[in-house]
Amino acid sequence: AGEVEKREGMMKQIGGSMGALAAISKGQKPYDAEAVKAAVTTISTNAKAFPDQFPPGSETGSAAAPAIWENFDDFKSKAAKLGADADKVLASLPADQAGVTAAMQTLGADCGACHQTYRLKK
C-alpha cells in the first residue's frame, strides 16, 4: 500500500500546485513569478515520476482505474505529455495573470484527459 500513499501524495501536490496557479489566474492572489515557477516545477517533476508509482499489484485501494494497468503505455504517454507541457511553461514562464491562465488551460486539459480515463469516479 506504500505505492498508493506515495502516488496519492504526488497527485495532491499537483492539485495544490494547480490550485496556486488558479488563485493567480482568478486574481485571488497577485502574480508572483517564483510561485508560478515553483508550482509548475512540482507539476513537471511529479508528472514524470508518476508512472513509476503504479507497479503491478498496486491496483486496489485507490481511485486508480484498472485501465491504467491494461493500457499502461497510454497512461505513461499522458503523464509524459503533462510533464512536457509543464516544461514548456517553465521554458517560457508566464509573465502575468493572462499567461498563467493560458498555461492552466493546457495543463488542466492534460490532467482531465488522464483523469477521465484513468481515475475512478468517487
From Swiss-Prot:
GO biological process: electron transport chain
Residues bound to heme c: 11, 111, 114-115
Pfam families attached to this UniProt entry: Cytochrom_C_2
Positions contributing to heme binding: 11, 111, 114-115
SUPFAM superfamilies hit by this protein: Cytochromes (SSF47175)
One GO CC annotation: periplasmic space
This protein's record includes keyword Manganese: no
The keyword Iron is assigned to this record: yes
Single annotated GO MF: heme binding
Name listed for the protein in its UniProt record: Cytochrome c-556
The species this protein was found in: Agrobacterium tumefaciens (strain II Chrys)
Top-level taxonomy: Bacteria, Pseudomonadati, Pseudomonadota, Alphaproteobacteria, Hyphomicrobiales
